[in-house]
Structure formats: C-alpha cells, structure tokens
Amino acid sequence: EAANIKACVESILAQDYPSAAFEIIVIDDFSEDDTAFIVQALSQQFPQVRLLQLKDHCKEGETLAYKKKAIEIAVSVAKGDWVLTTDADCIVPTRWLFLYNAYIQEHQPSFVAAPVMFIKTAGMLNQFQLLDFLALQGITAAAVGAGKHSMSNGANLGFEKAAFIAVGGYQGVDHIASGDDMFLMHKMKQTLHKPVGYLFHPDAIVLTAAMDTWKGFIMQRIRWASKARYYDDRSITVVLTLVYLFNLSFLLLALLGSWSTLIIALAFKTFFELFFLEPVAKFFKMKPELRFFACYQPIHIVYNIAAGLFGQLKTYSWKGRKVK
C-alpha cells in the first residue's frame, strides 16, 4: 500500500471541511513496505493524522479478520461520534466529509453506505471490472433504497460510533476473514431502530484501483463470495441462490447445445440488465462503457459461476495471506 497511502491521506486532508473537526486514523496491518514510515511523516506535518500499528494489539496469525480487528481498534480511540472508512488504495472527493455530515444531520442514520468506483485505465480487464462493478454499485444503491440493506463497500461507508458499540462491533462475525462492511451493516439494521441509508451523490464517489491481473480479480471475487454462507438474512441467501442458478442455466444451455435458446436468453438478459445499468452508468459518468456490455456477457456468466462455487469451497489468497 506504500504506493497509494500518501495520495489517499492527502485526499482526506484536502477536504472542504474544517480540519479541526475530523481526525485521520491509519491502521498499519503488518505491512512490510514503507507505509508506516510515510504515514508517520505525514503525522508530523499534520496533527490530525494518527498512525496505529496492528502489531501492537495482536500477533500475526492470531486472527483471520485483520481488517475487522483494525477497525475495532480505530473505533476504540476515535474522538468523534461518527467513523468513516476507506482503504489505502482509495482517493476520496473533496466534499466527502461535507456530504456525509449533511446526510447524517438530515436523516439521523446508524449506518451509511456510499458509492465506490474503479479508476478507469486502458485494457480489457479494467473495462470488464468497470462494467461488473457498475452492476454491483447499482444493486447496492437499489437494495438500500428498497430497505433490503444487502450490500455495502468498506471503501466508502460511515457508521455511528455509539451504534458500533451497541451492536458489539464485530462480535459473532470476527472469525470470518472478510465482511467488515456488510456484516456490520446487517447487524445494525437487525439490532437497532435507526435507519440505514445510502449517500447518493456524485460528489461522494470514492475512487479505488481495480485489480491489475485476472488472477487478482478472481481472488477478490472469491473473497467477496465467501461471505455468503454466513448471512443470517434468508432473503439475501435466496436471492443469491436464484442469481447463481440463473447464471448456471446459461452454462447448461451451452453444454446441451441449445444455441438458439441460449442466444435468445442472452439477448433478454442483456436488454434488461442494460435497462437497469443505464441510470447507474449515467450517475458514474460511464455511459460510453455500456457499448461493450454485451461482449462481456459470456465472461461475466462464467466468472460468477466460478466465484460462487470456489467462494464456498476453496482456500483463497489475499494480500499475501491464505484464507479459508
């Protein structure tokens, strides 16, 4: 993360918001690069920047959920009433804090999800990830708007510190490697009597780097899919199962050689998904990318099937760690 952390912290420091009204807490998760050194240097220049070392609170190998542990530590020392999270490879917009504050004051929520998008670069892999992530972001916003609260992304979310403490933080899900975002969202929705909201504003979009290899992309998606078995909300499990079976049906049609049926089904799938994605792409200013959407349908179907399967069965690698 050393290549990204300085730009990330500087984007937060550049907020259109009073510097005395927020602090930046960076948790160093056993990094072996210059991340800690870079943050320490920034903290000497900017007093609102604080560096915490995860190694001072737990031993490596002591937990699977390093990020959850890091967030719990940060919350325990945070001075404010609200905590916003992002990742070291992210860039936040200048009105990020202002927009969160305005949303919180108006809606009085316990948890707020917000938009994330990959940085656009050249190449087929990046283009595919942009389209895939557009769909995920659209589903996230639509689900929260419908009161289902099934998805969120730790690169851009906020929660009330008192609400975090009230639900016991990550207690009960701290044995699961991923899910620092969605499991917390689910706990707050199920336990508290305060709304869970979505900050739907183009000036709140956090940008993050996409995977630069197909292997990295697949491992990331397997990691995301691995959370599904732990969901308490049966409606989410049912929807995910139906989506998986829907994608599997296309593979079965191909294996059976039912090409005419497959082509018609793909055409209907593409039409309805484009209908859903058009306003999402407009929000993220990525409508030109939709012209490639139909071309990536076969890859999208196969990867969804593979990620869903291996997410439940396979040990995966993430940031140099083997995780089951």
What is the predicted function of each stretch?
Residues 9-60:
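Acidic donor-binding segment of Leloir-type glycosyltransferases
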Residues 32, 90-91, 157, 182:
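Acidic metal-phosphate-binding loop of nucleotide-sugar-dependent transferases
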Residues 33-34, 88-103:
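Acidic donor-binding/catalytic loop of UDP-sugar-dependent glycosyltransferases
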Residues 56-78, 99:
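Glycine-rich, basic loop-to-helix element that forms the pyrophosphate-binding segment
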Residues 83:
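Short aromatic/hydrophobic "clamp" motif used to bind/position activated sugar donors
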Residues 104-137, 162-165, 171-236:
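Catalytic donor/gating beta->alpha subdomain of glycosyltransferases that bind UDP-sugars
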Residues 149-159, 163, 182:
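Short glycine- and hydrophobic/aromatic-rich loop-to-beta-strand nucleating segment
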Residues 236-315:
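Membrane-embedded multi-pass helical conduit in multi-pass membrane proteins
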